[in-house]
């Protein structure tokens, strides 16, 4: 109705609610969602600049993500529906219209202050925390952080100690063996059958610092893998990045192994304080003696964990590692 007609009808033309506003257009909703259930399922084995290498039955193919997936990430280990040209012939390109529900997702953040979590690998059954006994020196804090991420993701952790020819593994084996974390050791030329037994028929992701021997281990387990290996800088004690992206390879005896790029930090800002505490099974029972609302930090008065260290019930290095993980984490639901 025009303003003149509104005025003649006695309606206040200064009242903007009297005017009809055009309705906001929206796309019509439909219940007829695309059905991809008849499409074959492949597994993403590597990613390179928007192209996804997938294993379908007994051959590999290259695919691109369908526009309908939008910003949804597709990561190594994902099980995906495939359509288009799935022959795997040279120059062919398939399409990924749907990502199947993930059983597990291993995540990390760049550091403890980064709010953006990154999904590393999907559908892994276990994680090998690859740690060199020397060159570079083992870092307990890194081991504990990956353990927290593994438990949070519902993935079984295994501590894999490499370069056992350079240093004695007994101290780390005793520390983590007492926490019911399986431990295996490797050295150049040693029999890898114990490692193979743990990998058979499982999907295992290798995580660790650069230079600890992940690619070397993968090359030994998968003939023809061709993963580039590097060396450790004598001045910094750090390894050089040789793997730039995650890659999944099928094991000769069954199962999959996923190599990941070396990391220098493993942030846990996506994990709540309660879940971090649950990952430190040797410390959790002691916190029952803490005052109500205790945050278990260095500044927390009368924290029972400090008394436990004083009485030799827990090692100082365990408490230091726990508090490092805890410092910048998300609050627990009960604290919100």
Where would I find each of the regions flagged by the language model?
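Structural detector for short beta-strands of small beta-barrel domains
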Residues: 38-47
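Short aromatic-glycine-enriched beta-strand elements
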Residues: 50-54
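Conserved lysine of the Walker
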Residues: 214
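A conserved segment at the C-terminal end of the G1
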Residues: 218-226
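Conserved C-terminal guanine-recognition region of P-loop GTPase G domains, centered on the G4
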Residues: 123, 130-180, 304, 308-316, ...
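Helix-rich effector regions associated with P-loop NTPase G domains
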Residues: 2-9, 14, 19, 38, ...
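Canonical P-loop GTPase G-domain recognition
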Residues: 167-210
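Beta-strand/loop nucleic-acid-binding surfaces
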Residues: 60-73
């Amino acid at each position: 109705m025009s303003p003149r007609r509104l005025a003649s009808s006695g309606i206040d033309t200064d009242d903007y609610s009297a005017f009809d506003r055009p309705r906001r257009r929206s796309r019509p909703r439909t219940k007829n969602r695309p059905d991809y259930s008849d499409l074959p399922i492949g597994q993403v084995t590597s990613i390179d600049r928007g192209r996804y290498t997938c294993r379908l039955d007994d051959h590999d193919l290259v695919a691109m993500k369908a526009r309908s997936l939008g910003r949804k990430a597709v990561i190594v280990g994902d099980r995906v529906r495939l359509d288009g040209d799935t022959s795997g012939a040279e120059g062919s390109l398939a399409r990924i219209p749907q990502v199947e529900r993930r059983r597990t997702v291993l995540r990390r953040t760049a550091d403890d202050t980064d709010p953006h979590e990154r999904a590393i690998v999907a559908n892994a059954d276990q994680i090998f925390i690859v740690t060199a006994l020397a060159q570079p020196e083992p870092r307990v804090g890194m081991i504990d952080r990956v353990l927290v991420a593994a438990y949070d993701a519902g993935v079984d952790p295994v501590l894999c100690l490499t370069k056992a020819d350079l240093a004695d593994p007994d101290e780390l084996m005793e520390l983590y063996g007492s926490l019911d974390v399986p431990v295996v050791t490797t050295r150049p030329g040693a029999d890898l059958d114990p490692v193979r037994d743990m990998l058979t028929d499982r999907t295992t992701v290798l995580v660790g610092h650069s230079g600890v021997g992940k690619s070397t281990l993968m090359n030994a387990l998968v003939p023809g893998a061709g993963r580039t290996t590097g060396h450790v800088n004598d001045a910094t004690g750090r390894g050089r990045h040789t793997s730039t992206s995650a890659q999944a390879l099928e094991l000769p005896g069954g199962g999959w192994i996923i190599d990941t790029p070396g990391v220098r930090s493993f942030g846990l800002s996506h994990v709540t304080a309660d879940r971090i505490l649950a990952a430190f099974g040797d410390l959790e029972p002691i916190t029952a003696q803490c005052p109500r609302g205790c945050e278990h930090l260095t500044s927390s008065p009368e924290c029972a964990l400090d008394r436990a260290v004083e009485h030799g019930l827990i090692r100082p290095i365990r408490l230091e590692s726990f508090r490092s993980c805890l410092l910048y984490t998300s609050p627990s639901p009960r604290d919100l």
